[in-house]
């Protein structure tokens, strides 16, 4: 479990995400095997996230990934989720997300558990 995240790691994550026009990035994608990701615009920090609830209503949509350049995959995700995480100030938060935000968070959460979009569906290459 992560207790403190180096500010330089967070800056490197944010810079990499912006450089590649991403909407999320996990620490593992830049070589830091810790349970941390950024998601959204402006990016929010998610430390030790846990998905507490997932809606039974799901939706399939296209996803891309900084780890799979040029690949696009149709992925089924829950439309709404409830997440528990710690922010960069060390505050534990429980919050619901839906739609696109929920999709991005589930995508980044997958990275923390060793999954890529290519594990979730048929790959369409650009």
Put a short name on every predicted segment.
Residues 1-126:
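Positively charged
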């Amino acid at each position: 479990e992560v207790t403190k995240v180096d500010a330089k790691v967070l800056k490197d994550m944010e810079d990499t995400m912006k450089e590649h026009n991403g909407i999320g990035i996990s620490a593992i994608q830049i070589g830091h095997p810790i349970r941390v990701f950024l998601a959204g615009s402006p990016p929010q920090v998610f430390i030790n996230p846990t998905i507490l609830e997932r809606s039974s209503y799901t939706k399939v949509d296209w996803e891309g990934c900084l780890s799979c350049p040029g690949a696009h995959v149709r992925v089924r995700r829950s439309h709404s989720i409830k997440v528990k995480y710690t922010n960069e100030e060390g505050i534990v938060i429980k919050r619901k997300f839906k739609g696109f935000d929920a999709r991005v968070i589930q995508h980044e959460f997958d990275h923390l558990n060793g999954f890529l979009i290519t594990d979730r569906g048929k790959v369409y290459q650009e």
